[in-house]
A protein has these predicted regions:
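N-terminal subdomain of lithium-sensitive/metallo-dependent phosphomonoesterases centered on the IMPase/IPPase/PAP
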Residues: 1-109, 278, 285
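Small-residue (primarily alanine) positions within well-ordered alpha-helices
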Residues: 31, 35-38, 137, 156, ...
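Residue-level signal for inorganic ion chemistry
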Residues: 42-45, 67, 78, 112, ...
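Solvent-exposed alpha-helices and their adjacent loops that cap or buttress functional pockets
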Residues: 55, 96-98, 131, 149, ...
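Generic detector of well-ordered alpha-helical packing
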Residues: 68, 72, 91, 108-111, ...
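DPxDG-like acidic metal-binding loop motif
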Residues: 98-157, 172
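An extended, acidic
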Residues: 164-285
Length: 285
């Protein structure tokens, strides 16, 4: 995929939503307030981690009562401010089929396994979509309190300052993030051969266990690029907007605009995004 193709894909996916600047700012305020309330619930849950109830949703995929309480808390904030909006959230939202109008897409605890093991790397992620297009988004790193925000056409910010993707274009200087497809055997077989090609050419690969934070760290220039083969809407909705507004590119593995759906995801600064797709698709057997 050429640089112009990737840029065009990014532009096509980043059409301004049917909302004014003031409306997008209001949606961002809701995202931030809801994420902050959910983060409070998660922090309180961390203090009683040993007594939490935890269930398996599938192969190595877990949910705790903190996930559910966090989702309920953020849902309360959203419904108070936008009673007609739809909530699409990870832990069984009844509105999961809706895509039109105003939809809030939320992961109440991204990095549940990290949380359950006491690893301080997990987040709350919320995006507001207008007719399927991200209009505003917020990600909170719960243990550190770091806040990442963006509005469509209004830029991305971290700790109150504008965010920009890294300018590193040399793979040898690049740090790449990824996520393992651990829940699906067929995806593991597809993914594992990708690692050597990236590992040989870059300064390192990191797998931290929370896709929302990986995307936020691409947006603020800590990582040069990120890829994962299968992500859900709540994993990427806010992160997609952060990266685009920070000057980066987000597509599927085949270079198409990255939808807010179950999808593959390749993200990065323009140079490293192009390099990563070329490397993943054209790697040696």
């Amino acid at each position: 995929m050429s640089a112009s193709d990737a840029s065009q894909a990014n532009m096509e996916a980043d059409v301004a939503p049917a909302a004014s600047h003031a409306e997008r700012r209001a949606l961002l305020a809701t995202c931030v307030a809801a994420a902050a309330r959910a983060a409070e619930v998660v922090r309180a849950g961390a203090e009683r981690r040993a007594s939490l109830t935890c269930e398996s949703k599938g192969r190595f995929d877990f949910v705790s009562d903190v996930d559910r309480a966090s989702e309920a808390a953020l849902g309360d904030v959203i419904r108070q401010r936008h009673p007609d909006a739809t909530l699409l959230a990870e832990e069984g939202s009844p509105d999961a089929g809706a895509t039109r109008g105003l939809v809030f897409v939320a992961d109440p605890l991204d990095g549940t396994t990290n949380f359950l093991h006491g690893l301080p790397w997990y987040a709350v992620s919320i995006a507001a979509l207008v007719d399927g297009v991200p209009a505003a988004g917020a990600i909170i790193n719960v243990p550190t309190g770091a806040l990442f925000t963006a509005t469509a056409g209004g830029g991305a910010r971290h700790a109150g300052a504008p965010m920009r993707v890294s300018e590193i274009a040399d793979p040898a200087r690049a740090l790449i993030a990824t996520g393992f497809p651990f829940t699906r055997e067929e995806e593991i077989a597809r993914y594992v051969p990708m690692l050597p090609a990236v590992m040989r050419a870059t300064s390192g690969i990191r797998r931290a266990g929370a896709a929302a934070l990986d995307l936020a760290d691409v947006a603020c220039g800590r990582y040069e690029a990120f890829w994962e083969l299968r992500l859900s809407p709540w994993d990427i909705a806010a992160g997609i907007l952060l990266i685009r507004e920070a000057g980066g590119i987000v597509t599927t593995l085949d270079g198409a605009p990255c939808p807010v759906a179950v999808t593959s995801c390749v993200a990065g600064n323009p140079s490293m995004h192009r390099w990563l797709i070329d490397t993943l698709v054209n790697r040696e057997p």
